[in-house]
């Protein structure tokens, strides 16, 4: 798949097999088959943030609706900004950093301070693709130093007088308000951000958006009628929040050691991403598709495929409880081969 006009998280990834493997159906389960309470506790809701409340307030409402102890959103939106606010629940909040650092897409209404030739507007916008320099706004939670951020693509959707509607895919931490200001300067007419909506955040898109009202209704249906179906629709397994990361698939016998904080050795791997780079953040999965941990790759794909020993990855955040899988069982007759 071409990477033009796409976020890094949208580039297709493929797995390569290192060795055959078996998984025991007695231990663990596919993420979508978790009991409902565990499903909620290890879930993520792709909330459609309305204009008005802060991102923190929206996350707090999600927490209150579902009765979970913790809820964390993946990247703040200003109060007036709408759109995607993926909110991880309970134990899934450990995966927030992986999603927060992923690329984002926005649709923006730029208001120029005077009308400019449409052809020139399109040309100048295109010149902002690639690395750009930005200084965080005065009212910012981060230190005000010049930073480099990557603009993956800009597509002008509509121009009417002084109004410009454009779609932009960018690196996490890009200030779209500052981008609008800089485009206005480059055009020589000035400009400012009039309105903004986030349309993609890592692997999440508008197709799976859920309103707070829909979330509340789904929870009530389950509590009052015992119907889990709508709740399972609006809440997605936490695994969907890291689907953009390179994957390493573990043997069942290696899972518990990683859950206890041990590094992942090469013999514990059955398959992995075809383009894993040393030092890259990777997601460790079971053969059933369960997220075990986020880890730093200590070898690249080629090195892992050639090696028979050594440390392949070091866990950074463990999301699966120790004891979910037994320690080093080998009874293949009780297993399902994959």
From Swiss-Prot:
Keywords: Isomerase, tRNA processing
Active site (record annotation): 78
EC identifiers of the protein: 5.4.99.25
PROSITE patterns (UniProt xref): PUA (PS50890)
Domain of life, source organism: Archaea
Domain PUA span(s) in chain numbering: 245-320
InterPro entries: Dyskerin-like, PsdUridine_synth_cat_dom_sf, PsdUridine_synth_N, PUA, PUA-like_sf, PUA_sf, tRNA_PsdUridine_synth_B_fam, TruB_arch
Claim: Ribosomal protein is one of the keywords in the record: no
GO molecular function, one term: pseudouridine synthase activity
Matching SMART domains: DKCLD, PUA
UniProt record, GO biological process: box H/ACA sno(s)RNA 3'-end processing; mRNA pseudouridine synthesis; rRNA pseudouridine synthesis; snRNA pseudouridine synthesis; tRNA pseudouridine synthesis
Catalysis: reaction(s): uridine(55) in tRNA = pseudouridine(55) in tRNA
Function field: Could be responsible for synthesis of pseudouridine from uracil-55 in the psi GC loop of transfer RNAs.
PANTHER family reported for this sequence: CENTROMERE/MICROTUBULE BINDING PROTEIN CBF5, H_ACA RIBONUCLEOPROTEIN COMPLEX SUBUNIT DKC1
HAMAP family: TruB_arch
Family membership: Belongs to the pseudouridine synthase TruB family. Type 2 subfamily.
Protein name: Probable tRNA pseudouridine synthase B
Organism: Methanosarcina acetivorans (strain ATCC 35395 / DSM 2834 / JCM 12185 / C2A)
Source lineage: Archaea, Methanobacteriati, Methanobacteriota, Stenosarchaea group, Methanomicrobia
């Amino acid at each position: 798949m071409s990477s033009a006009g796409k976020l890094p998280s949208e580039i297709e990834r493929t797995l390569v097999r290192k060795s055959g493997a078996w998984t025991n159906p007695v231990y663990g389960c596919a993420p979508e088959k978790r009991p409902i309470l565990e499903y909620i506790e290890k879930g993520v809701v792709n909330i459609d943030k309305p204009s008005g409340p802060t991102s923190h307030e929206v996350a707090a409402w999600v927490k209150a609706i579902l009765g979970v102890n913790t809820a964390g959103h993946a990247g703040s939106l200003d109060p007036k900004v709408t759109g995607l606010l993926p909110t991880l629940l309970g134990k899934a909040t450990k995966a927030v950093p992986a999603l927060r650092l992923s690329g984002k897409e926005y649709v923006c209404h730029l208001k120029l301070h005077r009308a400019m030739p449409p052809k020139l507007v399109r040309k100048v916008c295109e010149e902002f693709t690639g690395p750009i320099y930005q200084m965080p706004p005065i009212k910012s939670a981060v230190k005000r130093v010049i930073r480099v951020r990557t603009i993956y693509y800009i597509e002008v959707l509509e121009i009417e007088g002084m109004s410009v509607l454009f779609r932009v895919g960018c690196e996490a931490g890009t200030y779209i308000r500052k981008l609008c200001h800089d485009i206005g300067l480059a055009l020589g007419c000035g400009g400012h951000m009039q309105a903004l909506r986030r349309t993609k955040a890592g692997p999440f898109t508008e197709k799976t958006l859920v309103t707070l009202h829909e979330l509340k209704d789904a929870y009530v249906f389950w509590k009052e009628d015992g119907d889990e179906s709508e709740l399972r629709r609006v809440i997605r397994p936490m695994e969907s929040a890291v689907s953009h990361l390179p994957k390493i698939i573990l043997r069942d016998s290696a899972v518990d050691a990683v859950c206890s904080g041990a590094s992942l050795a090469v013999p514990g791997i059955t398959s992995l991403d075809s383009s894993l780079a040393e030092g890259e953040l990777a997601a460790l999965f079971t053969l059933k598709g369960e997220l075990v941990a986020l880890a730093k790759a200590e070898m690249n794909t080629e090195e892992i495929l050639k090696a028979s020993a050594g440390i392949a990855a070091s866990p950074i955040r463990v999301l699966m409880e120790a004891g979910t899988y037994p320690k080093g069982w080998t009874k293949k007759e009780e297993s399902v081969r994959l």
